[in-house]
Every structure is written in C-alpha cells, then in structure tokens.
Amino acid sequence: LEKEDITGNVCYDNLNHANMTRNRAQKIQKLQDIIPDLAVQGKSDTLVLGWGSTRGSILTAVDILKDRGVEVATCHLHHMNPFPKNLGDVLRAHKQVIIPEINTGQLRLLIRSEFLVDAIGINNLAGRSFFVKELADEIEAAMKGGAK
C-alpha cells in the first residue's frame, strides 16, 4: 500500500512503490544539508564516539583519563539517519575509534559497515549507565590494545 506519486491516491502499483521508496530515501539524505557538522573535543589519535545516554559517562571518563595524563578526543552523535556529513572525515582523522554503548554494539556495527572503520566496542548490558571509573579503565585498556 502506497500513495500514488503526485496525486497521493492509494496505489498498489509495484513501480510506484519503488519510486516512492527512493523519494523518501532522497528526502532523508537531504537532511544532511541542515544537520550541523560533528564537533570533536580534544586532540588525540583515539576518538571516543558516543550517542544517546552515554554522553555524561563518556565526558566524565575522558576527564578521569586526562587526570591520568591520557589524551582522548571525544564527540557525540545527535543524528543517526542520516549521519552528519563530516562523520567519515572525523573517523578517518583518528587511528583508533572506541564506541561505548549501553547495548550490544549497534552503532559500532553501523560505523563499521558504512565507513569501514574498525571501531572497538565497549558494551554495557547491565541495564544501567556506565560506572565512569570502569569506563575510563576500559577505554584506557582498549587504547593499549587489550580489552578488559
């Protein structure tokens, strides 16, 4: 079931459905023109990329790492579909990308498939936010090549 292109009438035509699906995808992609560029905080070869409720935990963990003398860059996604235009450039500007998530790593899978970046996931399945010291320890371990 689809609306007919131009008239908006109900239409069951396969070709019309394909056309309308492409139209919707193009409209979504055009949103990239108004989505602000992704802002990166800090300078480092390692980027910690977050989204959603991980923001506070990531920022606090990064502060803990700075106190330890470990430099980490961070940024936070506010838009997922489409991604900000500069996301690919931001990812490629860092040798290592770490993505803490309170799930099984769906964003990491999207980043890996869309941008071919071998991002490292830190996944929390405890049903609560990250403990910031624990997250800082896991980020530092990932930076050294080992997962905790």
Residue ranges and their predicted role:
Residues 1-148:
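Flexible, low-complexity linker and terminal segments
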